[in-house]
């Protein structure tokens, strides 16, 4: 897994858990499927920019914070 995708996966899950959200709740807030959230958190997918922005908005963080 590339370093950026690895960081994104870890940060996404960390931010979700910090907010005490289930994958289902995050998926609903971001307008995505639960299976897609799961794949992102496992580093099996890299989101396009619009999805990154949706996830950041749902988690109330900046998109760059999910990549750092």
Language-model features: locations:
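Recognition helix of helix-turn-helix/homeodomain-like DNA-binding domains
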Residues: 31-46
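Short basic helix-loop element that most often maps to the first helix and adjoining turn
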Residues: 10-29, 54
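A detector for short, charged/polar N-terminal pre-domain segments
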Residues: 1-7
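Residue-level marker of alpha-helix boundaries and capping positions
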Residues: 3, 14, 42-43
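Conserved hydrophobic/aromatic packing and binding residues within compact polymer-binding modules
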Residues: 12, 26-27, 37-40, 66
